[in-house]
Amino acid sequence: MTRLLAVIFLLGLVTVPASAISMKWKFSTQDSRDFARPDFDDSSWQEVAVGHKWKSAGFAWFRSSITIPDEIDGNPTIGQAVGLRWNACDGGECYVDGEVYTRYDNDHPALVVLSESAKPGELVHVAVRVFMGPDTAEHEGSLGQAELCIVDPKLVKDEFLVTIDPGKRLGPLPRSFAGLSQGAGLPDYDDATAAIFRSIGIKWFRMDNLLTNAVKKNDDGTLRYDWSDLDKRLDFMKKVGCELIFCISYMPEPFDAVPNPERHSYPRDWNEFGELVYQAAKHCVDRGTPVKYWEVWNEFNTGWMVDPAGWDHLKTYTTLYDVCWKAVRKADPTAWVGGPAIASGPWNENDPRGPGVNGEEFMRGLMEHCEKTGAPLDFITWHEYFQPHSIMKKEAEQIKEYLNDYPKVKKQVKEYAVTEWSYAWWHDRAHDNEIGAAWAATSMLRGWMAAGVQKPCWFLAKDFSSGLQGEWGMFTRENKPKPVANVCRMFNSMMPIRIECKGEDEQIASIASLDPDSGRVTVLIVNFAERYGPPRKIRLSAMNLPSSLDNGVCRQYLVDATHANLWHDPARCELSVVREVPIVSANAFDTLVELSNNSVMLIEMGGNSGP
């Protein structure tokens, strides 16, 4: 799948151009994990090279026994870190000498370090299982890249220092990775599902499609309200212990002005639709489950909505917004109303600042409308998928810049909410493995948290289909945690007070926090590269630890290619301690860890219970 996307190139990763040495690979469209074994007999397989194209379903395999050459592009390899840069199909997993080394997708290609200190003539057995797509259909595939390179030794061999100082407190730690989003409702609303969401720390939950089935026809043709679906969701939120972000959508079929099976017609009668919204908000209050957050519609800027004759999308949206906020505030004067829930960033098409689809038109359009009319805008919402963390941070900053032109609205806005965000808007194997999890951690630390976004909502909460099919869910249909769910748990297991934490480069991001009462300290470290990420050696050094940590213990929890990873091992998909290190003295403590690319580690010092 080819995707034109903004990417960050990891500066300094490869210091020597990639080798043009012709490499031969054995290839098969069959699938067996035995193919990763160095001693597997592949003599009957087809021999191919870069540029090979084929069509198949499921998975395909490449194998090669690579001999380290004397030189790569005229540079001696002896003693150098020698790597293989690889990209093929939608993604895949790379094996070195029979063991999983790394996974990749085609927008985040792999770097396989064959040797940290190469010896010419050294033989390394490499196998790659490539993903042909998350479904059972046939897809076209190609071997796009397989080339040797010399890797910057500073990245592979040298220790990267992360320092923390609990004596320097920076205020409350933002609890940003505590929201979910689900379109079209959950597959179920049972107690077990509520319990798993509660256990990982979910505090807000955005849902759309809440009004689609709220109006029913009686046998005599009259209409009635049906709150059964809404009640089910409200009761579920209470069991989870979280706030509902009520996305006012979609149009009930009896209210259509024009037939539209996608439920995106404007209403036949604006007052009639306003009464529905009022009754929904009043119903929430009357049953003792008032809703604080009311978001007006979903991705209106994409052009899905059918407009009244002679109207443009923005006029239709601001009219709908007025109908909704007046209805909600009539039922509950304390409720918050927000929008515009745009798809993609706050820019229009072909804007050099970033991606978007009528984004600036709708973002500014709503702000200007509220500035002129006095309509409330309590929180601002938008959606984003896949973009690098730098783009995500820039989006939030751009929206705040727009607000400077609307001073009355700026005073109203209390929060920013990305009511849908995820690794990709398409089905992708990265949703099921550690790539999506590490991307999410990086996006959270360097994107949303860095920009002050209070309420990101991960899309999707739970898969609709059984098994692993590349769907967006944080959990499978069977309530098994994917790696991203374990990363969410890591974030919500951190202590409440942020402390000084230094240690960041293009790949590594980190954050630390303290519980002043117990003295427990937590550190979260992410290794994620947009392209060609090597493993990194991380030295964590702590000073001024609380005295209660004398003779304590440092516990390490890990999400990577082989740990807490449902894709790799369904029997060991839960987050667990991978290593314990004694803390002899709180005066000074350090520990060395090695993090592969696409990995997230939570380090907990002190305390007897884990996440």
Q: Which residue ranges define each predicted feature?
A:
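Aromatic-lined ligand-binding clefts that engage carbohydrates, nucleic acids, or primary amines
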Residues: A36, W45, I66, I72-G98, ...
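Carbohydrate-binding surface patches
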Residues: F62, D505-G552, Q556-H563, N598-G606
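Aromatic/acidic polysaccharide-binding cleft in carbohydrate-active enzymes
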Residues: E420-R520, L524-F528
